[in-house]
């Protein structure tokens, strides 16, 4: 009798995706982040569902409903902090996952890469809308400033902002629609993640060497399922450490103050995972220019397949490219740090230099270095 996992129409799909999937034998721990992102998404959907049972999206009660969750709901404080810090873990895994793709040349799998960039945009939109919901002081002003950026769009900008707000400021209508979108989008993300996997399994996984690995593949289960489980346990350990010991480490203290439209915080900033893009936005004195630079700082990922000039797939055997890749990583850390600093000298100048360096490395230096490496290898 043939095994049910190979014949049943539904179980067969799971079998081809997670059990009998031919996987390159040499993929490292950097390939764990895909499954960790799935794990993070499940945590966010489950905790978010329980939070939605108690949250009210009304300007008068939003802040108190979050307080009520933390004080009166059984383990409400745990659910709330798991959800808030789960977003941070999600973005840490996302940045590492994208970084792995850039380092090992995974962007040459065009469909998978482009769906991945769309996923990144969807996760960023979801996280932003979720940040607005507790209606703390920084939530409110962050929402006001970021949505107001759309007013930089010529001709329709102001109308567009008022349409998104549902009025003349971030109010009840804004909160209600953001809550609706914040609830729905994670399920859209889950669907996109399945499409991402579907495209990945059309070509098979990349591997650290960047070489074709058809002759050296092993089944996903038990080898990589155990490896992914270990990764999930390590992530869970780090995550629960953060949630139970320092739950407010990555948050903003201003969010413990209810939103006050009459009192602007001295320094408005988004969550830490948006700071690099926020710095790029602030570095350009022109509003429309800043918004375009902000969007392009993420959209630039779509250009990597076009900018790939090397005859080699991966950076594993390209020390010059590696050097500039790590300079780019250091630059992103610098941008993140500057985003959290006040808008004054020397932070403005450092931010502008780091922003120029970010685009220069990606658009000019990395392709040029790749061509130089080809020449040095006489390719």
UniProtKB/Swiss-Prot annotation:
Family affiliation: Belongs to the cytochrome b family.
Binding annotation for heme b b566: 97, 196
Keywords: Electron transport, Heme, Iron, Membrane, Metal-binding, Mitochondrion, Mitochondrion inner membrane, Respiratory chain, Transmembrane, Transmembrane helix, Transport, Ubiquinone
Name of the protein in question: Cytochrome b
Cofactor: heme b
Binding site for a ubiquinone: 201
Compartmental location: Mitochondrion inner membrane
Organism: Hylopetes lepidus
Reported function: Component of the ubiquinol-cytochrome c reductase complex (complex III or cytochrome b-c1 complex) that is part of the mitochondrial respiratory chain. The b-c1 complex mediates electron transfer from ubiquinol to cytochrome c. Contributes to the generation of a proton gradient across the mitochondrial membrane that is then used for ATP synthesis.
